[in-house]
Amino acid sequence: MGGHILVTGGAGFIGSHVCERLINSNEKVICIDNFNDFYNPELKENNIKGIVRNPNFRLYRASITDFDKVKDIFNKNKIDKIIHLAARAGVRPSFRNPGLYQETNVKGTLNILELAKEFGVQNFIFTSSSSIYGDAKIPFSEDTLVDNQISVYAATKRCAEILCSTYHNSYGLNVTILRLFTVYGPRGRPDMAPYKFTEKIFNNEEIEMYGDGTSKRDYTYIEDIVSGIIAALEK
């Protein structure tokens, strides 16, 4: 593949696995992560402990909402490709702090797109979410309309998708949007169901049920997600 690859949110669950795969393939990786307190930041430190000292890995502790700081990172590094994973996650928390979700997921994405345009990035991968489908019929279809978001989180992800499409149409930026369905696996986020259920089972605690227990989720294993992201980056 070659060149320098920027991974935003690279110390998170998915991002750390992406960085690890790239480093193991001898790629040069620039990682931006703000190590926020959505969950214990020490978990993120642990996520990247195996690669943080690798000479092909550069870590910048910064927020994608800080345009000037991120631009400085672009100025210091020849970034050829971008995997944009950084985002405020979580459906329920998005209702409690909608402004923060807009700031990170919309404005932050706009910052990265603008810098990608300015610095001539070759390929831009944006990771969206299955939540944008709202209460769509099952099974999902790629032709399903996505104008019925039912959470602030989903709305911000859809806004970011539209921005990505606009930068492709207006500036020719090579953009690929991936709508990820619930990801699970090693180093999974502690707020996600697999982590919570496992912890409660080990502690012999009751598992809280939302609704009537008939809802279903599509789960995707982390290594499959990483393979898909890398394939999109190489196309």
Regions found by a protein language model. Give the residues of each.
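N-terminal Rossmann-like NAD(P)+-binding domain of SDR-like oxidoreductases, especially those catalyzing
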Residues: 1-183, 223, 233
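Short acidic-hydrophobic sequence patches enriched in Asp/Glu that either
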Residues: 40-43, 189, 193
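Short, hydrophobic secondary-structure boundary micro-motifs
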Residues: 103, 208-211
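A glycine/serine/threonine-rich, flexible loop-to-helix segment
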Residues: 139, 190-198
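Glycine-rich "substrate-gating" loop/helix at the edge of Rossmann-like oxidoreductase active sites
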Residues: 150, 181-191, 211-223
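Alpha-helical substrate-binding/gating segment
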Residues: 195-207, 217-235
